[in-house]
From Swiss-Prot:
Residues 1-106 are annotated as: N-domain. The keyword DNA repair applies. Residues 351-359 are annotated as: Interaction with PCNA. GO terms for molecular function: 5'-3' exonuclease activity; 5'-flap endonuclease activity; DNA binding; magnesium ion binding. Interacts with PCNA. Three molecules of FEN1 bind to one PCNA trimer with each molecule binding to one PCNA monomer. PCNA stimulates the nuclease activity without altering cleavage specificity. This is Flap endonuclease 1. The gene is FEN1. Structure-specific nuclease with 5'-flap endonuclease and 5'-3' exonuclease activities involved in DNA replication and repair. During DNA replication, cleaves the 5'-overhanging flap structure that is generated by displacement synthesis when DNA polymerase encounters the 5'-end of a downstream Okazaki fragment. It enters the flap from the 5'-end and then tracks to cleave the flap base, leaving a nick for ligation. Also involved in the long patch base excision repair (LP-BER) pathway, by cleaving within the apurinic/apyrimidinic (AP) site-terminated flap.
Amino acid sequence: MGIKGLTKFLADNAPKSIQQQGIGSLLGKRVAIDASMWIYQFLAAIREGSQWGNLTNSSGESTSHINGMLSRTTRLLEAGIKPVFVFDGAPPEMKKDELTKRDERREKALAELEKAQEIGDEELIKKQSVRTIHVTKKQVEDVKKLLGFLGMPCIDAPSEAEAQCAELCKDGLVYGVVTEDADSLTFGTPIQIKQLNFSESSNKITDKSPSKQKNGMQIIKLSLILSELDINMDQFIDLCILSGCDYCGTIRGIGTSTAYKLLKKYHNIESILKNIDQTKNPIPGNFDFSKVRELFKNPLVSKNNQIKDLIKWSNPKYEELMEWLIKEQNFNEARVNSYCERIKKSKNKTSQTCLDGFFKTASNERKNTHETPSRPPLSEKQKSETRKEVDSSLSCDKKKVKIEETKIISEWGAPVSKNLSSQAEKDLAENSSEAPNQSSEIKVNKIEENKDSESSTVENTPSLQTKSPEPTMRPVKRKLNRLISESDED
């Protein structure tokens, strides 16, 4: 069931949180899929007589869940989507009452179905047939076997699949969670993906408001829900509990809209219960909201460091897949071959599309990196001060270059030019005590290396140039002058 009335409430009161998007927006993204929900949909197709209906094997067992999963998974791969399938584990103890009610409704539906069949009411037969659906362990194992042949990752949740999907999404292992149950948001799913069913309308984007969008893929963002409703996560959980969930009863007379108004006024369930008239709004005996709140905040899940190694896609086992589908499930051989060819093509297409997207993104990043930021024009005073600073720095740099050159030459026992400044000569005298008798007038281009001298070996003698290197500040000056000129033009 999920959360009663939540989707419509969000469409009316937080419309920006629901975005209709095309399936192409999921290209290259990982998504966690509530597999149990999909199996239920495929089994319902039998009763509704849709494309997967009335499919059985030689034993008379329905195979619509296998055919439906094969078809939709193939479409996912063709769309460049990487699915991670998550299956339900043992239900929480608090869900026991809800499961009992479901069993009772199923028994009642079976009785109504028999009556409808007796009178031949086709519409009523379809309606009651859907209500009798129960996913068996055998059907779940069939789907897992199929996905194993396809090389898809499957995860068995210790409890609720929606909670495990939310955990994957919160830790960034998947982009979003594919499910129709709104309680995935209550478990903290940052992004819920609804109606990913590849129907004709699922890839159409309309201008209709979220409340009027019955078809088409929807992206629901939890952060936008909280900001639009102006509540925090704890209050959102309380809103879901008051609206009606699978884990406790509901308070008569309080639906989603009323619950929201009460939360805005009283902030939490504890304060609400103290202020409402419990004669008009009686509290049911199974309304243990504190335990339910804790379940939503800290559900039983496998931590991602325990299961992240399971999220791997492997190459399909085509031969085993074909043998199982054709021989054991009585699938048409030509149809199976067609699926296999589509999967092979989709893998090549997805790889190339992702590669093209990578290079396109990298190219844009390089382009953006080399864009020259706009500079404000310099005032006349700033221009004058800049020129003075450059001239002063350049003058100091010339002296520094000559002195450093002298020090290097003296240190290595090489002759020194007599054109050095007096200050440079003083610095040289202080640092050349080891060679006091060396003449300073020997020309550089007539140096003869002493091969026997340890200080003049090829390895440790620096190369000498007759021309002093250009002072390092000259390029800086040219650049600054160019900037000033550009400013003048502006």
